[in-house]
Amino acid sequence: PPASQNNEQGSTLRDLLTTTAGKLRLGSTDAGIAFAPVYSTGAASGKSGRTMPNILDDIIASVVENKIPPNRAPKINVKSEIKDEPKDDKKCIQDDCSKRYSDIQYSWICDKHVLWLRDHKNSNNWKLFKECWKQGRPVLVSGMHKKMNFSLWKAESISMDFGNQQADILNCKDSIISNTNVKEFWDGFEDVSKRQKVKNGETALLKLKDWPSGEDFKAMMPARYFDLPLPEYCSPEGKLNLASHLPGFFVRPDLGPRLCSAYGEFALFLYTYHDIGTTNLHIEVSDVVNILVYVGIAKGNGVLSKSGVLKKLEEEDLDDLLRKRLKDSSELPGALWHIYAGKDADKIREFLQKIAKEQGLEVLPEHDPIRDQSWYVNRKLRQRLFEEYGVKTCTVIQFLGDAIILPAGALHQV
């Protein structure tokens, strides 16, 4: 029964979800695969400043609060209420983990901000993942492709099966979207000579926009859909996927899975300062798993050798362990990520608005550079962001088979 009728029993979580349905705004669906949110540090968005994880945390807190009978005051642990000087959380976590999880192969990277689980087969990984996830930290898991049918994810295989379909393709240089035959995209995926040219003769840097996604993915590619790992989390029907437990009358967001495919720009001579990416800076509205299932090797005139690509990657501000991976001949790098904690969103937003004004761009009151995904923060800007706002970039190289798991509220660009 409702709490108003019986104070001894609190409302159920479903009751609270139902009565709060009008308040929940799931926001943008430009995200990947949902995990059940376990924390919320996302920046305020919109006029209300409320995000979905914030509201759900409030709901769960209300359930706990309403379960306490009014005639029995909760016991307060005085020691827990008296807080000492803040400690280095990262150091505490690492010291504790090294003792409790000695049977797990793991490392801390990016100034101890990201957990790297090196053995995807270890059945105890979830224990350490859970501890890290409570802190709202990104997680990197290596070797996930070894659990998958690699032949399904080759560019050649996808082109052969679906090349006759039409899809929206974005040119990352000028942000122009065109609807074209999928085969044209895949023909130039590894052969630079077959890539489209723009009006000035430059080679286009193309991205296949979220094709296919959600229910379309399952219907179009059932074999690939069921080849995806972590179905209990990643499947729309997964028991540990919070979205699968929402009441039926909710408008369900498209949380994937989706296939994200793009040409690489690091292999080309003409890009020196990496001023563009294939995914601009944006904020995640749900927890996300991104698995690098295939890395194409570009060939043709104007393409750097593998050693040349590695040299360019080494110019990035990388963790020592990532530099070591680059030198491992068995590893194949495929994507460069820049990740930021959700708590830094306001500073980043203010910084980008400042840069826009410096460049003479119009900054409207309702303009949000993060929500609009209008910026790729290049190396010079990342340095300024650190010097002027104290926001440090977490740079991660994603190798073939790596799964990058980001909590809701995190920001990233690729």
Where are these regions (language model features)?
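Generic detector of intrinsically disordered, low-complexity, polar/charged segments
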Residues: N7, T19, L24, T29, ...
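Hydrophobic transmembrane signal anchors and adjacent membrane-proximal interface regions, especially
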Residues: I33-F35, I76-V78, W337
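Eukaryotic intrinsically disordered, low-complexity regions enriched in serine, threonine, and proline
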Residues: D58-A61, E65, P69-Q105, L268, ...
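Active-site region of the double-stranded beta-helix
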Residues: C92-R137, H145-A403, A410-V414
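Cys/His-rich Zn2+-coordinating "finger/knuckle" modules used by eukaryotic regulatory proteins
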Residues: P1-P2
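N-terminal low-complexity, Ser/Thr- and acidic-residue-enriched intrinsically disordered segments
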Residues: E8, D15, T20-T41, K47-N54, ...
